[in-house]
């Protein structure tokens, strides 16, 4: 254990999330193309930053985006390591305070327990350990935001299902409001530091739903790539104090059993990696559909997959899709009684309901109202348009739904946080590459409407 780090301190630091991954990073120099400083905060130990060779001092600096209390810094050195270096923290990128220093670096991974508050963290090398430069596979900073009023996760901590409601760690019934991504295989460029800063700070969202399609060019085409993307997005949501819903976005194959093997593999890794976090929820089956996909099929799938997650993450809420496009069975001629009479035999779970206001009228609204008095419900997707995610907005019907959700403290997530051409995407086409996400100038009509409702003060 590095000098100054105690066993007790290491346990405390481990409770804080990784807050540096994907953040803006700069360096004093770069040895060559492909070794840029961003490679040291990309979550991969196969890419690295390297400074110019033969020059002291050199530094690498990460901008956490807002003031944080920093409790841990982990440095994974390449062969070109620092013999002497300092870890420093700053409120403004100009005035620096040392939180760790050593003159006996040996090139091993340095896992440092530190204590400091600031927006910027810098590793400042003063003596190279080799004739080369300085090179890091990863620079990981762990901590928590200290923004005024606290983040949703700071306010609520580990969520749990209490009776038929979602509650925070204090036992208070709460409602989360936020946005769903579009498919990350198509619109991953809409999920970056600037857009998620806007979602957390300008929109004041509580939750980000990370929609990873399985087919349609998604997970099945490259499981490693898409799993790593989800890891990264969980870290980015965590760094901003938002909850993250990991959405297993099955669609074309409406039977969840079709992808059960893939789901076991994916959720095992996600739960293993993130089980120490307090902000992760697992949505294990987006919109089961098809005449042969009965509630019994979905329930059996849940009974097989939930233990896979619980083996590694015993505390996070798990969200179970419902029959006929997560409509509680309404789109297939049923209703909530099929679940009430035969619920999933597991604790700390909720059932999902999706609606699109221009397509789903009073039958859906009434079913939701009844179901919410008997079952724990989470609306993990809704739109103000038709079920295609396009067409005219029905804001009047949408408001009826949102009024009911507020009354019954049902959490909701809107579809979708992208610049897709359809009316359901909140940004106008071309917004994401240009990076202008705050305010309303680049929002469609539906985007302005839902942003206003997400920004309404939370009752935490």
Give residue ranges: language-model regions.
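N-terminal carbohydrate-binding accessory modules
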Residues: 14-16, 146-207, 220, 456
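Short, conserved beta-strand segments of beta-strand-rich sandwich/propeller modules, principally
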Residues: 72, 120-122
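Extracellular glycoside hydrolase catalytic/binding regions
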Residues: 183, 188, 260-281, 285-419, ...
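Aromatic-lined substrate-binding rim segments of carbohydrate-active enzymes
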Residues: 192-253, 260-265, 310-312, 397-408
């Amino acid at each position: 254990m590095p000098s100054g780090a105690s066993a007790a301190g290491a346990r405390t630091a481990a409770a804080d999330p990784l807050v540096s991954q994907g953040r803006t990073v700069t360096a004093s120099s770069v040895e060559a193309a492909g070794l840029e400083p961003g490679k040291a905060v990309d979550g991969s130990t196969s890419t690295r930053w390297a400074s110019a060779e033969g020059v002291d001092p050199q530094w690498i600096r990460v901008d956490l985006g807002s003031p944080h209390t920093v409790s841990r810094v982990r440095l994974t050195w390449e062969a070109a390591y620092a013999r002497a270096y300092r870890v420093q923290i700053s409120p403004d990128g100009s005035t620096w305070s040392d939180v760790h220093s050593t003159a006996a670096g040996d090139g091993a991974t340095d896992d440092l327990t530190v204590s400091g508050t600031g927006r910027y963290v810098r590793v400042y090398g003063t003596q190279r350990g080799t004739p080369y430069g300085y090179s890091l596979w990863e620079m990981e900073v762990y901590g928590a935001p200290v923004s005024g009023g606290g983040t949703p996760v700071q306010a609520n901590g580990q969520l749990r299902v209490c009776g038929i409601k979602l509650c925070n760690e204090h036992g208070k019934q709460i409602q989360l409001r936020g946005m769903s991504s579009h498919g990350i295989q198509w619109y991953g460029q809409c999920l970056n530091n600037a857009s998620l800063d806007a979602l957390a700070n300008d929109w004041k969202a509580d939750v980000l739903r990370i929609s990873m399609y399985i087919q349609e060019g998604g997970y099945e085409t490259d499981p490693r790539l898409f799993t790593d993307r989800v890891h990264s997005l969980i870290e980015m949501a965590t760094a901003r104090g938002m909850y993250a819903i990991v959405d297993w976005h099955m669609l074309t194959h409406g039977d969840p059993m079709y992808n059960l093997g893939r789901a076991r593999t994916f959720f095992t890794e996600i739960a293993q990696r993130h089980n120490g976090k307090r902000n992760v929820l697992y949505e294990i089956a987006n919109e089961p559909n098809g005449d042969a996909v009965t509630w019994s099929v979905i329930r059996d799938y849940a009974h097989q997959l939930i233990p896979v997650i619980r083996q590694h993450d015993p505390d996070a809420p798990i969200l179970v899709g419902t029959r006929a496009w997560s409509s509680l069975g309404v789109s297939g001629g049923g209703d909530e009684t099929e679940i009430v009479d035969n619920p999933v035999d597991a604790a700390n779970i909720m059932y999902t309901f999706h609606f699109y206001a221009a397509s789903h009228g009073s039958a859906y609204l009434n079913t939701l109202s009844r179901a919410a008095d008997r079952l724990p419900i989470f609306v993990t997707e809704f739109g103000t348009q038709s079920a295609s995610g396009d067409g005219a907005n029905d804001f009047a019907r949408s408001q009826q739904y949102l009024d009911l959700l507020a009354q019954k403290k049902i959490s909701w997530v809107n579809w979708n946080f992208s610049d897709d051409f359809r009316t359901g995407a909140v940004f106008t086409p071309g917004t994401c590459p240009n990076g202008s996400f705050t305010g309303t100038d680049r929002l469609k009509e539906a985007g302005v409407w839902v942003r206003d409702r997400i920004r309404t003060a939370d009752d935490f």
